[in-house]
Amino acid sequence: MRYISTRGQAPALTFEDTMLTGLARDGGLYVPETIPQIDAHTIAAMAGQPYEEIAYTVMRPFVGDTFSDAEFRGCINRAYAGFGHAARAPLVQLDQGHFLLELFHGPTLAFKDFAMQLIGQLFQTALARRGERVTIVGATSGDTGSAAIEAFRGLENVDVFILYPHGRISEVQRRQMTTPTESNVHALAMDGDFDDCQARLKDMFNDFDFRDGVKLAGVNSINWARVLAQVVYYFSSAAALGAPTRKVSFTVPTGNFGDVFAGYIAKRMGLPIDRLVVATNQNDILHRCLSGQGYHKGETIPSISPSMDIQVSSNFERALFDAYGRDGNAVTQLMDELKAGGFEVSQGAMQDLQDHYESGRASESDTTATITRALAETGELLCPHSAVGVHVAPDHIHAGTPMVTLATAHPAKFPDAVEAATGVHPALPPRMSDLYERPERLTRVPNDLAALKAHIKENRAT
């Protein structure tokens, strides 16, 4: 299995090199040259299987021979051993034909744990074998950073620096990044919004002297391994609901498009997905684009679902690459236009996108009302991001086809919004009950590339 860049000018790589590289050297994102297929018999057999077994079946064809079977199984088993639910990703019925996929039973209470815990194990295995050390730099709108720090804290071959927008994430998200005591992890509170953090991250990857000098690696959802790990729970949940004999639809709250793109990959692999619904908050650039209005950046408006407060949706580039017939030159042109503010999608590419994705949006009042109603009618406490999905989903439900909405985070990660909507203060799990008492360790940094590079050089282990 080889991986190619969405911009067509970077060398093809193995899975291991793709994972350790992150962003391609031409600025593009890596995607597999071909999509492996999983037949109906194999999908049917997944019903009732342990999550780890399904994960091995789904991901193994993408990995090739860069990890042995024993190495890969070991990484999977260690990654999910610490999850707080035996099913790892349990389904809960909300309403007739509408299910919630709980993706918040990992160590940091968010769906990012499914990928990040696995990547931590894969990185450590590969780097130990190679005798190498890397510097991971990531940007987060809240959940990616805490998941990355949790996954890599204390590992011998990795230094981790996470950029997050100062004052624009929840207190729980911040404390999950700032309270670990291991010396190899660093939380950097940067001036600006998430798009600024993501832009500086890409600037660092495009500075090849810096990139090579510190052996830069990335674990944002630009990293293909992140997307791949998220493909698994589409298979596990669909099989539990009757796939392959029954089609299943999914509604995905998303800002950076990686989680819903994982669903698209599952569909391309042969999983009978009927509808993939992109659910956005008031920062609705993806909904506007998929509605035929072009992709044009605006001002990021802070919301109660901050992980979706994004204007530059990195993984959308992967969707555009396929929509434009895998034409790297066309994607490069679009990304150049995006630097100037935005672009229009060609008629043919838009038709392809709309063949695969539907979309909807939730206002702040919609989100709050959905949290209130869900508790009253179902007894479920929803985080604001999950509530965005639950609000959007009903318009896309069709009789006879189950709809699964991805519950992306535990409500206790956003206690203020949940309490304002319900009067209930969601409690953290017992293992995190002292989070608010732990001392914090963070560094304020400017939105300045030179200052960021200097800080990383000075504070990484040599």
Question: What do these predicted regions represent?
Answer:
Residues 1-462:
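PLP-dependent amino-acid enzyme catalytic core
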